[in-house]
């Protein structure tokens, strides 16, 4: 099993990444974890926040990153969406041949929510051509790949554990624990994002992931939006195994 980490976009003021992940299994499956942000959505977000802070660029687009690894869109067997915010599902429709995995509670929440964040991305994920497996809670969804529902950042968000032989267990925390500062005991984790929908659930989600780190013997935590630790991770074409 191999885990590739790559950058789909960057938040320029802090150097915080918008990452994507590819897992190549021992039986030659290609599993994508989140599908990134489109240039159009980045422009729309920049308009909303009134600044040109989110930068994408052609080289960072998921299809181009995968192409440099020799992988075409039709070679992606499965996609795990941690959630449906703009930087996690932008290219879902590019992988319509894949099986998609998302928490049932999140899928239903996104469909019914009035949250503008889902209105921005609905065209990417609410497509009858996409085949979703709706997951209920923590479970192994593919050999060596498990999801952990936290509900922190938004209802039904899930983190992903990838079991690697050399590296050990890797936790892709997603936005449930988006930066390393949220691990500290003397901070309020909910202070770190305007997109968090329930501060108390953020705190509960972080506490759950802290327990998971110990109970699942996590050897590496990858934080989604932390420019301070991003340079320390291996990036594609390098990989963890």
Model-based region annotation:
Residues 28-30, 165-170:
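Active-site beta-strand-loop-beta-strand hairpin of nuclease catalytic cores
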Residues 57-60, 65-71, 75, 102-149, ...:
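Metallo-beta-lactamase
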Residues 2-5, 20-25, 137-165:
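Core dinuclear metal-dependent hydrolase active-site scaffold
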Residues 47-102:
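Active-site metal-binding motif and surrounding structural segment of the metallo-beta-lactamase
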Residues 38-40, 84-89, 155-157, 178-181, ...:
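Active-site environment of divalent metal-dependent phosphoester hydrolases
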Residues 1-53, 208, 215-216, 232-241:
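Zn-dependent metallo-beta-lactamase
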């Amino acid at each position: 099993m191999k885990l590739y980490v790559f950058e789909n976009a960057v938040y320029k003021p802090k150097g915080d990444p918008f990452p994507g992940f590819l897992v190549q299994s021992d039986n030659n499956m290609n599993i994508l974890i989140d599908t990134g942000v489109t240039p159009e959505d980045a422009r729309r977000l920049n308009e909303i926040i009134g600044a040109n802070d989110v930068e994408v660029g052609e080289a960072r687009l998921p299809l181009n990153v995968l192409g440099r690894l020799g992988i075409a869109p039709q070679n992606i067997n499965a996609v795990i969406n941690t959630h449906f915010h703009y930087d996690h599902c932008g290219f879902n429709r590019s992988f319509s041949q894949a099986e998609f995995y998302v928490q049932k509670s999140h899928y239903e929440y996104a469909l019914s929510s009035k949250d503008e964040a889902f209105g921005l991305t609905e065209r990417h994920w609410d497509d009858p051509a996409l085949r979703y497996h709706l997951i209920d809670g923590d479970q192994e969804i593919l050999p060596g790949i498990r999801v952990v529902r936290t509900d922190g950042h938004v209802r039904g968000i899930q983190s992903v554990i990838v079991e690697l032989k050399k590296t050990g267990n890797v936790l892709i925390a997603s936005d449930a624990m988006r930066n390393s500062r949220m691990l500290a005991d003397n901070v309020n984790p909910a202070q770190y994002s305007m997109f968090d929908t329930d501060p108390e659930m953020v705190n509960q989600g972080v506490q759950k992931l802290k327990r998971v780190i110990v109970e699942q013997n996590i050897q590496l935590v990858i934080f989604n939006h932390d420019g301070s630790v991003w340079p320390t991770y291996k990036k594609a074409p390098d990989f963890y195994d």
